[in-house]
Amino acid sequence: MFSSAHSGLLEKLFHYIDLHQDEFVQTLKEWVAIESDSVQPVPRLRQKLFQMMALAADKLRNLGAGVESIDLGSQQMPDGQSLPIPPILLAELGSDPEKPTVCFYGHLDVQPAQKDDGWLTDPYTLTEVDGKLYGRGATDNKGPVLAWINAVSTFRALQQDLPVNIKFILEGMEEAGSIALEELVMREKDHFFSSVDYIVISDNLWLSQRKPALTYGTRGNCYFTVEVKCRDQDFHSGTFGGILNEPMADLVALLGSLVDSSGHILIPGIYDQMAPITEGEKTMYKNIDMDLEEYQNINQVEKFLFDTKEELLMHLWRYPSLSIHGIEGAFDEPGTKTVIPGRVLGKFSIRLVPTMSPSVVEKQVTQHLEAVFSKRNSFNKMAVSMVLGLHPWTANVNDTQYLAAQRTIKTVFGVNPDMIRDGSTIPIAKIFQAITQKSVMMLPLGAVDDGEHSQNEKINRWNYIQGSKLFAAFFLELSKQHSGHQMPSSVY
């Protein structure tokens, strides 16, 4: 896989990373200590976000990168306050036309976290317990961003020429919807991204605790609300119960018409757009190393709907799913309040798979709910709205950087990676692919039990350090495998 010269350099790179792993962990501790929460619209936290982006910019400049901090202006909040948006960092290290250029995307903002949410440690004090580094942002996404930086800094420390040109795009609002990112990518398409050959994202997890993975697809997401309204005020059930169409009863019937107890979506035509299953895809599922019992235990689930690995993965990745999320306007507090809500709003979403279109799904959902509501002969008013429509994403697993990543994983970890999709929605992958027309790859570092977004988020020291080695080796292998520009395309 690697020439003798490259093998010798790899040994030096890996040895340096091992020797300096405590320094790398200390840097992660410093980054985790910054409460860069983008979700809560609080001036103090916005200041923390600016502090985080400035720290990252300094880190990149110390590597010798040219860094541009893009001012994004301010954000008007529903309560009338105006909050500054943290800048997006565009950084560049090397511009040799003989080398491929790889751009790394990451985010430095985090979800909210407090000790009394159920954390065993202070979420903003990186704490190591049995090789696990606990802290908010450790795996999502500060750890992977630093692992990439660690790889670059190792070449620098050993006075070795980087085999690829490196670019960074780092944002601070991913957890709040990546405000202004798509517009920036569009604006920079013919500038910052013009020389980019490959884009790497490391913002998801492996399927297991020990076996690495490469991700080649994510599901899209259509988020809906359905409102049923009689009037703005609530009713007393003793005064009005039995003499009107209750909005809650209508809404429960509507939500109950969407999906059955086996997870099958009941909306007519919803499966018609789905890409057919290929033999190559079936083989991929068979080759994935997954223990169903372990997966159930890790996720604290007594039993899933499906008994085989292949069925479970297909329903998680390549079949659409429908989830009901909640009801606004309903009484949900302790006690025995006998109110009839005058207006209720149901919320549900459908995860899309290739080659489903949000606009088609919106039409199908609306027609289905209107038909169900019509049969109830209710005097209430119903309104359906799709508030979010995000496309699914797939990559070409046979393009240069995927082949390079597979070989690199074999070198660093000694095993071939699981080729996986992600059942969630990561819009940035589709945004990069659609706008830049470059090869986009998701190369995760974290284990399945890292707990991103939840209490006790962590990244294993082993994943963090081996991930730093992985990225360093990837630079060498990508340089070797690079054979000109390849347009990303659907894997199926």
Swiss-Prot record:
GO cellular-component term (any): cytosol
Residues bound to Zn(2+) 1: D140, E175, H453
InterPro entries: ArgE/DapE_CS, CNDP/DUG1, Cyt/Met_Dipeptidase, Peptidase_M20, Peptidase_M20_dimer
GO terms, biological process: proteolysis; regulation of protein metabolic process
Cofactor: Zn(2+)
Cofactor: how and how many bound: Binds 2 Zn(2+) ions per subunit.
UniProt EC number: 3.4.13.20
Function of the protein: Catalyzes the peptide bond hydrolysis in Xaa-His dipeptides, displaying the highest activity toward carnosine (beta-alanyl-L-histidine) and anserine (beta-alanyl-3-methyl-histidine).
Family classification: Belongs to the peptidase M20A family.
UniProt subunit comment: Homodimer.
Name recorded for this polypeptide: Beta-Ala-His dipeptidase
UniProt organism field: Mus musculus
Gene behind the chain: Cndp1
